[in-house]
């Protein structure tokens, strides 16, 4: 694949060095992860105040037929699992609701819980760099250049621990409805809990990446979560390969993907 100046700049920002092959042969770009500083450990979160913790209750009914405003309200008011007692706020999702691309992550971290938006902080900066290298963004843009970003869980697990099965089960209908409303042409599943929810697979990400899966007829590409890549920068080049696979898959469906 030939890189343009924008893509080279973004790859460098991701920490991936790119070399062109010698002129006498076919032109091939080889990406190699550059050394990166280890991500700082997140600061411990303050324990929630029992006086303000909401009482547990059933998940809102009728999720499968909700429109965007109703779905957002349902997520904000959900008390169906124990995570409701420790959240600052829910993290619904962000982006153009008609975006051609959808990114599905795992669970909010401390900064996401505080700001109410998925993928912020260093992992969000890395994700934005990855998306910009594909000509995509989470800000204002036409749907073909936009992504809608959501997490599998809408509330932060305490101490950034892994989600538990019942928590994933309670949040899953919200994610399913988000996908139904967006109607994306491509889904990027980032991390094993996104994979578990969308593909019903317990296989590790490393075994599922590198191929195109299907979710309800929508092409889905598995890749590493940006937080994982910050801890394991040697896998950034593999993540870039996954993004290129998704982009190639999109080209026949969306001419703008080749622009």
Show the residue positions of the predicted features.
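A polyanion-binding, active-site-adjacent surface
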Residues: 2-259
